[in-house]
Amino acid sequence: MKALQKTAISAAAVALLTGLTSVAAFAEEAAAPEVSPVTANVTVASSYIYRGITQSNNKPAIQGGFDYAHESGFYVGNWNSSISWISDSYNAVSTPVKSAPSTSAPIEMDFYAGFKKELIGEGFASDFGVLQYYYPTTGLGGIQSKAWVTANPSLRQTSGVNPSTTELYAAQNFTFGAVTGFGKFSYAVSNLFGLQNSAGSFYPDLTANYDTGMYGITVNAHVGYQYVPNNVVTTVALAGAGNGGTWNASYADWKLGLTKDFGGGLSGSAYYTGTSAQKVGSTYVYATPNGGNAGRGNAVVALTKTF
């Protein structure tokens, strides 16, 4: 009887300890914070480069956005950046041709929605969506260099061109050990950033990132090709090809750089970008207000905080 009683007590003790362990484990799991479906980010960069073309005339930019991702895979988001290329197009020369619309604002506002899910396996998320680039302005005066506008003031288009753009996109993410990245295809269903007759432009690109496993450093590489149909006839084209002329606005771009994870949602990046954007005569297809190459090689540094 004593032996049986001892065994019963031991069994009870084991059950009690097991129960306490389970409760402790449950409490630990319950204490783990839930992953929020809402994230935010803010970036300070030495320049805003998009598809190899400067959007801030090689000057600093501040950027930020919000994202909501549902567990089903659907998501929506907004991203914004300071820019100068719209106001630069008006300020290229002196009055009277520089007068920008009073409702213009030095900002780009992007709105997007889509569906992202690992449809073909872990680490291989497929992504489909629509992206609206919105620029608060009553009209774009053309992306013309100061030299050309000075020589052809009567041909300058000072309003009426809408730079806002709508794109559809499809992307396939991949993971191969320490290498991650994605291939993406973007298609413009509207004119592309104010370029006339450019609906149907598309941009295939490939991005790859290699986690070195040292000091939180990742190597980043990117290549893309901006195709613009019809050699786009624009007021800008007149600059290098004569009245009624055309030029080739298509080009390739690339980027190579490093990203450093500092922890706590803080990261820094440094990279170099370049393009094959063409020159027509003495005029660049994508020109800065003073006639420089907006697609020239650029070194950029940035600091990003995610929340």
Where does each model-flagged region fall?
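Cleavable N-terminal export/targeting peptides
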Residues: 1-35
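Residues that define the transmembrane beta-barrel architecture of outer-membrane proteins
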Residues: 36, 58-62, 105-109, 124, ...
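Detector for outer-membrane/organellar transmembrane beta-barrel domains
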Residues: 161-246, 251, 306
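Structural signature of outer-membrane beta-barrel channels/translocons
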Residues: 67-73, 114-120, 173-177, 209-213, ...
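Transmembrane beta-strands of outer-membrane beta-barrel pores
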Residues: 44-50, 70, 80-84, 117, ...
